[in-house]
């Protein structure tokens, strides 16, 4: 039996208190299972935003998607995680990554290490969080045991190894970092993503419990005119054709029926049962979710 679908929305736009609560309630009404906050300069501070999201809603879980480990001291992060889990009634999911925007580190006056150094820092952070939050002497205490569910966003070999060892949720962006590109990331095609997921499964083969697999959908649009929606992407990725863009795993553009079929195919081919969309796609993807409930 395939794992049931879960759907999350990453609420990337800051908002005043009443507007923030209203959009969290709207996401709950639309059927989202997880309300998420990013960790970028210019976005909301994740933990207070998630506590407010939990207070405004009753059903969805809340989570970071994903924290930049380079912004955080592990001991201070453990305090934030435990407090947020307690204040949300045990609804928190912790998403971690290495960060990929050098300019944000420079703005914050924080060192920007090599890729290997950033992975090492993330590994130390995960291990220290497990030690601190697993200790009965740690104050404050999280609600969830043995720990708050951990999501790690990964693509490279070392990150996939770390994810296989530690994460309850393995998150794939279906993109890779490329210095000098317009966004810092370029999308992965289906064959490249096949290889990344296959490597993760190999590295995770000895796990007692299989992890949930997550995919971040970068573009979602219910439309009869895919070319109009995808034109900006074609401008950002030289050499990418409309046909290739339409087939990218992280791009869902087409009619509602086509997108429902695409989401089912993502789970069948790659194992992605937990799908996350960005806030601008929240309403559009809700149309697709309606065709997948109970699947």
Locate each region found by the language model:
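Active-site-adjacent structural elements that line small-molecule/cofactor binding pockets in enzymes
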Residues: 1-295
């Amino acid at each position: 039996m395939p794992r049931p679908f879960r759907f999350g929305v990453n609420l990337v736009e800051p908002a005043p208190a009443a507007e923030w609560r209203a959009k969290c309630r709207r996401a709950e009404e639309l059927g989202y299972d997880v309300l998420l906050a990013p960790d970028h300069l210019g976005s909301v501070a994740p933990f207070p935003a998630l506590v407010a999201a939990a207070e405004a809603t009753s059903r969805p879980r809340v989570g970071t998607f994903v924290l930049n480990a380079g912004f955080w001291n592990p001991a201070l992060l453990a305090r934030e995680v435990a407090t947020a889990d307690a204040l949300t009634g045990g609804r928190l999911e912790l998403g971690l990554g290495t960060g990929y925007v050098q300019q944000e580190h420079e703005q914050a006056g924080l060192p920007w290490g090599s890729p290997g150094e950033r992975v090492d820092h993330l590994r130390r952070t995960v291990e220290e969080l497990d030690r601190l939050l697993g200790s009965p002497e740690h104050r404050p205490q999280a609600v969830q045991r043995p720990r708050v569910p951990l999501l790690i966003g990964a693509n490279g070999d070392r990150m996939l190894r770390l994810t296989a060892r530690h994460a309850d949720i393995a998150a794939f962006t279906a993109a890779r970092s490329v210095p000098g590109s317009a966004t810092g990331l370029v999308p992965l095609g289906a064959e490249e993503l096949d290889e990344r997921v296959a490597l993760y499964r190999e590295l995770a083969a000895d796990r007692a419990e299989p992890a949930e697999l997550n995919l971040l959908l970068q573009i979602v649009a219910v439309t009869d005119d895919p070319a109009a929606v995808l034109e900006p992407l074609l401008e950002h990725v030289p050499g990418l054709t409309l046909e290739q863009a339409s087939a990218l795993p992280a791009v869902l553009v087409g009619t509602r029926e086509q997108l429902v079929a695409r989401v089912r195919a993502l789970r069948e081919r790659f194992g992605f049962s937990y799908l996350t969309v960005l806030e601008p796609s929240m309403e559009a993807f809700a149309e697709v979710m309606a065709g997948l409930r109970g699947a």
